[in-house]
Amino acid sequence: MGRFKQHKIVIENTLFLSIIEFVNMLVPILALPYVIKTIGKDNYGLVIFAQSIIAYIIIIINFGLNISAVKLVSENRHDKIRISQIVSSVVCTKFILWLIVTLLYAICIVIIPSMRNCWELYSIVFIATLFEIIFPQWYYQGVERMKYITLIRLISVAFYLSTLFVFVRTKDDFLYVPLLQSIGAVLSGIFGLMMLLFVEKVKYVLPSVGLIKKTFSDGIPFFFSQLSKTINENIAVTMAGILLGMGDAAILGVSKRIITFAATPGEMLCNALYPRNSFNKDRIYFRGFLKFIFLAVVIEVVIAFYLIPYVVEFFAGDTMPDAVMVTRFYLLYLMFVPIVTYVGYSGLIAFGHAKAFNTSIYISVFVQLLLYLLFFATDYFNMYAFVAANTLSMLSMLIYRMVYCRKYKLV
């Protein structure tokens, strides 16, 4: 009966996470044909290039706390006093980091010509960073109440969709795209914080300096791993925007968004299993889901291969003919992502091997940067090279994690 209850909780949490992630990604994707047609491919490329820069900044604000805090909340879920201390110290630490980053970001806008010329865009996309402070997803994930995450994220999606077609009418309205996304994120974050305080009854207490330092130090290993992961995920769009132009950045952005959407079910299952495996540390349970994820991913990749031309045509029309081949080239990356995520979080971290988890990400970044150095040395720059670098770095991470899962007798 206990085993059935565990499976029931995981299934429910996976369902809630999958619903919101599908809605959260499906709505912008459904709006993508309208956005590209209205603001143009180059303006869309400029927007996602700016957002790729913000992705690095968000990692600094989170500082690995979105991982370390999930484990702490999960392990102390029945201790209200300890939970209040954890929540307060995490929010306070993030706010301090946000203040520092805001100052540095403002300086960059002033001194870097390309950012100064588009200061409105870079200022608008930065608004979204507030969401990382006020929305305690790590708490809801730790206590396994994914339905709250679903409800809160729906607010952001609903706001964006309901306002997009009202405010974005011409090419000159491209700034409204990131603005509406940012406002929706902040509104949903505020709602999530209110639920934490008034529904979950978590009290905010002023954390001591020592507790903030401890929270900060707990996040350090995960910060570097998350920074490395973000480099892996965003470097293709960033480099395309710098070296190839905003049109190619737009193509890579659309292709990556399609692949990310396809990877959502596996990612959500992994997110739902992580707190459960952290709590139980059941090797048989871990191995069973690993086999299931592998089989599901193989089936998904085969189906995706045949559907990609229709999906690209729906999203981008005939404005991005190269996106079909680029997206198909990304399929190996799609195959690796859920497995890498599962063995990393539910395997290495959940069973107390965070060092191996972090090292695997450092190695993947090293592989990717090495490939980019090779591209520079040979003057070989194109979208397929960037996708190949992404995929090979993910493969190196998978190999390393599986070796250590084998070493620790997890598989």
Task: Locate each region found by the language model.
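Interhelical loop/hinge segments that connect adjacent transmembrane helices in multipass membrane
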Residues: 1-10, 147-150, 174-181, 190-233, ...
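Membrane-water interface segments that mark the loop-to-transmembrane alpha-helix transition
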Residues: 12-24, 50, 55, 59-109, ...
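Interfacial segments at transmembrane-helix termini and the short loops linking adjacent helices
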Residues: 41, 108-125, 307-338, 352, ...
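Transmembrane helix-bundle signature of multi-pass secondary active exporters and lipid flippases
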Residues: 51-59, 229, 252-271, 300, ...
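Helix-loop junctions and terminal segments of transmembrane helices
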Residues: 62-78, 259-281, 344-350
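Hydrophobic alpha-helical transmembrane segments
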Residues: 126, 150-200, 256, 363-367, ...
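Signature of the first transmembrane helix
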Residues: 9-66, 220-246, 300-301, 369, ...
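Membrane-interface junctions at transmembrane-helix termini in multi-pass inner-membrane proteins
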Residues: 119, 129-151, 270, 275-279, ...
